Amino acid sequence: RTGFYMARDLTFYNMTASHEYEHERIKVLSGLMAGEYDAVLTTPDAALGYTVPPEILKKTTVAINADEPLDLPELAKRLTGAGFVRVDLVDSPGQFALRGGIVDIYSPFGTFADSDGDTKSGAYALRIELFGDDIDRMGLFEPDTQRMTQSVMAAELQPARELLCDKPALERLKKLIAAQFRATKNEDAMEELVRETTAVDAGINFTF
């Protein structure tokens, strides 16, 4: 049982960029915590690079049980804190959507237990249908067709990003953006700063 932990590409990109390699690193880190690997292959650059600490990885893992009530605003807050991006329609790993009493989450990596009690792991798209705070139905769905394919009794979602901003960090970021807004007279720059503030308020994550 061997994993490969690859180096991070230190180029800046926004939420629409592919995070495939980052998700692979989170998968390996999660596997290490769970004792799933006998060895991990990596490079000197990757081994020396900073990543999410074990306690943060554990803290930002989101667990959902079909038999337990679900607080929708709290779930949205936890997903945002775990690096997931809220969108209108889920089609890529690391996204989630809220539509009335329906929640769609595309986990880059996690585990789930099916209706037979068998536990599986990997990337998967999860749909939760609520009746009030109770889960009426929970299962996997195909992002391409938006159709549910099988029932799920429990799910554990690993964070979607390595570098996560907590609330104090986001508040500091908003203050920095506001200071830049006051200092600039360029209309294009001002519009971009407004978009950045809106993104922060909406829980959109920008990382590298």
Language-model segments: which ranges?
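ASCE RecA-like P-loop NTPase motor cores
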Residues: 1-208
